[in-house]
Swiss-Prot record:
Source organism per UniProt: Mus musculus
Ranges where the Phosphagen kinase C-terminal domain occurs: 159-401
Major localisation: mitochondrion
Protein's name according to its UniProt entry: Creatine kinase S-type, mitochondrial
Other remarks on this protein: Mitochondrial creatine kinase binds cardiolipin.
Length: 419
């Protein structure tokens, strides 16, 4: 069972811990060290006005750079979350990485659940900009994991080669990867694998620690799209998520390798359902069933996932808030991908394209990774249905082009209107 003591060792529970347990050497040392770090940071900030610390964002093209102003920076610079995470730590990855040539990146991360509250003056407009107008100050996020509502979930497998649905989940009471200590990261691993040992039937499997894999085993899993890549992404390195690699990282998968859990990469956990072929309905059904069972097993052991009604499920990057869901397929569309209307068709269908191997990769043999753009403001069922309908439209366009027929750009999908 997960350690209850480690759950108490968080900033928001510090005073309660002193009262309840007294000031033992262990608790005093742990908590006073965090307080000292926070105090040192505050004193350092006092040496200079906020204007002297304001980052140079004149050549930047990310959501953080577009939303951050000197006024917001001055208001938030000296604030900290209960665990000591600062605004400058939130935005450092966006300062170090001005932008991406194909995708407008977010440019900031959260260090803990409270980051989204303490620094809401910046996070809220960034979320609204990134998520198609979703306003977390007035809107509520819907959740729906009823896979029976999905329709037309079988793709033409002459075009669709594989189907996949993933999401992330964070364990409440532990810092997120940019800010977690080694002990917290190891506790995430312990909580996750202890719960996953309870999975039965077609979900049953085993855990593989990254530190115990050979380089060859790791690369084979990466090449087969089962395992996360090595920590070379600027998001990971500049945000501090690659610290102590590969300590307490790993992958759990069922014996069929169709249900997988990544542990301690960008998020505490990434839950993935995948298989070859075009049966997205079956992939989503297994995803929903497995995710619900994982949450039940986590709760049985006294833990819970980070969630609130404004932001949905809380994850490290604001781009994944809400559902955290990315439903995608590998689809071969040689004619459509060369059509000048392709990008506009994707935009109106609320889809995005990546190369065969993901972001920053080329499309091999005209095979693209097509997935939903949105994460928040629509439920899991809605997003998967958008992908199904959209990919079917793309395949239909490809068939028309093969026959020499014209294709049309579809009208834009209606904006969500959740209160």
């Amino acid at each position: 069972m997960a350690s209850a003591f480690s759950k108490l060792l968080t900033g928001r529970n510090a005073s309660l811990l002193f009262t309840t347990l007294g000031t033992s050497a262990l608790t005093t040392g742990y908590l006073l060290n965090r307080q000292k770090v926070s105090a040192d940071a505050r004193e350092q900030h006092k040496l200079f006005p906020p204007s002297a610390d304001y980052p140079d964002l004149r050549k930047h093209n990310n959501c953080m750079a577009e939303c951050l102003t000197p006024t917001i920076y001055a208001k938030l610079r000296n604030k900290m979350t209960p665990s000591g995470y600062t605004l400058d730590q939130c935005i450092q990855t966006g300062v170090d990485n001005p932008g991406h040539p194909f995708i407008k990146t977010v440019g900031m991360v959260a260090g803990d659940e409270e980051s989204y509250e303490v620094f809401a003056d910046l996070f809220d407009p960034v979320i609204k900009l990134r998520h198609n107008g979703y306003d977390p100050r007035v809107m509520k996020h819907p959740t729906d994991l009823d896979a029976s509502k999905i329709t037309h979930g079988q793709f033409d497998e002459r075009y669709v080669l594989s189907s996949r649905v993933r999401t992330g989940r964070s364990i409440r009471g532990l810092s997120l990867p940019p800010a977690c200590s080694r002990a917290e990261r190891r506790e995430v691993e312990n909580v996750a694998i202890t719960a996953l040992e309870g999975l039965k039937g077609d979900l049953a499997g085993r855990y593989y620690k990254l530190s115990e894999m050979t380089e060859q085993d790791q690369q084979r899993l990466i090449d087969d799209h089962f395992l996360f890549d090595k920590p070379v992404s600027p998001l990971l390195t500049c945000a501090g998520m690659a610290r102590d690699w590969p300590d307490a990282r790993g992958i759990w998968h069922n014996y069929d390798k169709t249900f997988l859990i990544w542990i301690n990469e960008e998020d505490h956990t990434r839950v993935i359902s995948m298989e070859k072929g075009g049966n997205m309905k079956r992939v989503f059904e297994r995803f929903c069933r497995g995710l619900k069972e994982v949450e039940r097993l986590i709760q049985e052991r006294g833990w819970e996932f980070m969630w609130n009604e404004r932001l949905g499920y809380i994850l490290t990057c604001p781009s994944n808030l809400g559902t955290g869901l990315r439903a995608g397929v590998h689809v071969r569309i040689p004619k459509l991908s060369k059509d000048p209307r392709f990008s506009k068709i994707l935009e109106n269908l609320r889809l995005q394209k990546r190369g065969t191997g993901g972001v920053d990769t080329a499309a091999v043999a005209d095979v693209y990774d097509i997935s939903n753009i949105d994460r928040i403001g629509r439920s899991e069922v809605e997003l998967v249905q958008i992908v199904i309908d959209g990919v079917n439209y793309l395949v239909d366009c490809e068939k028309k082009l093969e026959r020499g027929q014209d294709i049309k750009v579809p009208p834009p999908l209606p904006q969500f209107g959740r209160k």
